[in-house]
């Protein structure tokens, strides 16, 4: 799995979910993607689950009208029902969307912690670090980023990883995690990577990330 470039971190996912009964959204917590890009084959939800998903989707329509307060009110009221969805992936996805939209950071942290224990990934771990910042638990950040770096290093050890054109982003993310974990020598590694990158678009993106996440902090 190649780490997508996600700086600054955007924590909310696409609003519309499950427009069709036979589709599912597979967005990682720390990644923003369109519904179209994340559709995959999925067994049909049972009638009760689908009814709840439909209610959530209807609530998201308020965003298009600019009624953010109304949207927040409706999705908060739906939380007890969302928790009864039997499909694990859809329940967790929608709950995470709701928690992040309502800035229920402790609830998002607790849910993400459960997801990490079940299926660890650098994306989820990165999101956990973000939530620690939101919860003002800065003392836990070095360990969190160290763990994220370890997970990403394992993901990048797969033979196909370096063949992916997005590999420089993943490599930069690893250096960034290590820097955030307290290994200050990785600042120089980030700069060297930027300077050695030949692709102008990637180079520009990496430089912007460095400026935003390192220089301007």
Report residues per predicted region.
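Generic helix N-cap/helix-start motif at coil->alpha-helix transitions
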Residues: 45-60, 84-94, 119-127, 165-172, ...
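Terminal, low-structured helical/coil segments at or just beyond the last alpha-helical repeat
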Residues: 170-217
């Amino acid at each position: 799995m190649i780490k997508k470039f996600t700086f600054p971190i955007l924590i909310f996912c696409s609003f519309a979910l499950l427009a069709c009964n036979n589709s599912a959204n597979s967005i990682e917590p720390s990644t923003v993607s369109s519904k179209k890009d994340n559709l995959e084959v999925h067994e049909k939800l049972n009638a009760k689950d689908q009814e709840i998903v439909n209610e959530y989707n209807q609530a998201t329509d308020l965003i298009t009208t600019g009624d953010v307060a109304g949207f927040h009110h409706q999705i908060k009221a739906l939380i007890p029902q969302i928790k009864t969805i039997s499909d694990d992936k859809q329940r967790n996805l929608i709950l995470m969307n709701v928690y992040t939209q309502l800035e229920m950071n402790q609830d998002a942290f607790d849910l993400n912690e459960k997801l990490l224990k079940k299926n660890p990934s650098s994306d989820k771990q990165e999101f956990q670090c973000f939530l620690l910042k939101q919860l003002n638990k800065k003392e836990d950040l070095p360990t969190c980023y160290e763990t994220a770096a370890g997970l990403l290093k394992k993901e990048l050890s797969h033979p196909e990883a370096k063949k992916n054109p997005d590999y420089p982003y993943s490599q930069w993310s690893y250096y960034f995690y290590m820097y955030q974990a307290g290994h200050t020598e990785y600042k120089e590694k980030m700069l060297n990577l930027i300077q050695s990158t030949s692709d102008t678009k990637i180079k520009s993106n990496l430089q912007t990330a460095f400026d935003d996440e390192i220089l301007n902090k």
